[in-house]
């Protein structure tokens, strides 16, 4: 133990003796380990962690079999997890055998009136046993039980989250019994959840939870408790002791047929009845909860972790090179220690202790850096409207990962230099007096090999950064089929005004006219779905006179008369909508070019098409009055989708809110305040939210931005590390070859010849590194294929640019040592020898 302590003391002295070396080594390690830890923390939170509830491994999800997800086609989007209807949930709860308890939940949105202002609140509908099934105990008060979730509940309590308690009530201990106003209804707080509980959807949190029975109170005639066509509840259960997921799945599958038979809605379309009755339920692991965020980011995060791992390998190669150079200058010291009896093991241990000290300091700083970077990463995948909630605090898994990385780093960059430094015999080392015997043993030394590895790995990182950056740039510059500039989105809610459904269309028209009257507004239109932001209703259509066998799945958007004018989408034929297209006139529609092609009708204006019946609406026929040019509808990445545009004035079920698309003559940000003020003056009861359209589009590219930013940062870091390694190697080479350079200059070699000699070695090393790296790039880039847009993972342009960048780095890194070589005095060099 005493000798080990002496080794640590000596190691500390040696590191302090070489502050420049120590600073470079520690900073490199901190960046490499910090980046890896930060990305692993995020991956851990999104994918690896189980839910923060009691015995999460006992939880399972119950849902529709993947092939039956079309049953929920009331909306068109990326929802992977199909929800249930309330009647179906109640039947599952009452007839299953494999679960000790079951819970249902669904997302909700409320208008929170607190502190004199109205703002959105994130809500959960939960069954009475929700918290008990999960084993969540309240921080204060109590949580719901079965008696709280009974049909006809008129004064339900509300359970609030820990975060909501802190932000809205300042963590007051007397919060239980106080009131919150949600969508104009006052509810009493009965409890507060613990700080670590966010619900069952990873990446989201909630503010308030209400029992499912309260839906009738908030939704009135549109309540969903008895509806067999509203799919809105997720189902989770806790397995009974001794039951496995496979056994529970078998039992639930067995009862699927009678469950769907019993819950078949009386108004279900005849064409879809068989699909409904043949559906099956399945049980899958629920320990990690639900997560759309996970579906979107799991693959990118694994890829980023691999990229960060390459950065760490470059760091290790760089540090190994530095340690080899340092060891060569300590050969005389090591020789003396061997001569006086120190064993090779003892010297290797001493050198490894110095490596361990570097790794320990670098890892400690890396953990600090990881926390800051982790917070940045979470913020990078969320927006002000869609805040991401993830706990990236280090747990045992993260600490274990970091410790493993630190140990491997020690082995990779510390062991080889230590073993190599002790291979030289004391006599030989004493003769050369520390002038680099080890470095001169082979022409293509280990240090040159390490630089080649750095260059090869840097090529992979730089090429990856170019691929992701160019992919993002293509998306940002893509022609969406309409003018995206100077557009503003206004979301206007008038639920608080309690306007009768019969008067909502007229009121929406008044709101539109008020917006249009705002100075600076050029055009304005209402709409159901905002372009390029996902979602929207979908259904099947076919031309009248043909059969449903010719049907085409299309997206729908109900829009105002000036929609196409506002977006600068030209009509290829026919007319736009007008105010005369009312509920008392013929149903009219405008279709896009793609739908016309899929319907095999080059001149669709004047033709009629049929919309397939849904559980909420029978078959409907529309007359085509216009054909619009194709424009991106749901997503920038999509190919042209078949789209049906319906007239807003013919909306049979107008909602208590509307979205308006505004074309401005001014910068949109300058117009927001005027529109907001005008609408408040028009009616103070309106809930208004405004956002620049272009910023919404950019928010839809958060994943692509994250990949471009991080891969670009890692690419730059790799270039810096590679240039340091190359510079260090060439500088040491100039020092160790001073005699050779002196002789060359004595024999007539000029400055250009010496420059060429050193730069030739730099270029040669980079060329070899690029040659090694190209096949690696071609192999690994295929894993990024699904994350690229309109770009091949083997894109030759990106590869060539990456090679040229590395060549430029080689010339820059080699120039200073080459210039120093030209300053060698032949007489001094020869006399020193």
Spans of model-derived segments:
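Membrane-helix entry/capping segments
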Residues: 1-21, 53, 117-120, 151-153, ...
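Alpha-helical transmembrane segments of integral membrane proteins
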Residues: 1-22, 289-293, 322-349, 353, ...
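Short, strongly hydrophobic transmembrane alpha-helices
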Residues: 18-46, 50-52, 315-316, 359-363, ...
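Internal alpha-helical transmembrane segments of multipass membrane proteins
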Residues: 23, 27-31, 298-322, 708-728, ...
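Structured, solvent-exposed hinge/loop segments at the ends of secondary-structure elements
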Residues: 36-176, 181-188, 196, 228-231, ...
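Small-residue-rich transmembrane alpha-helices
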Residues: 39-42, 282, 320, 356-429, ...
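"Rare, low-scoring activations can occur
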Residues: 189-199, 216-294, 511-524, 593-594, ...
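Interfacial "coupling" helices/loops that link adjacent transmembrane helices in transporter permeases
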Residues: 315-359, 725-763, 770, 783, ...
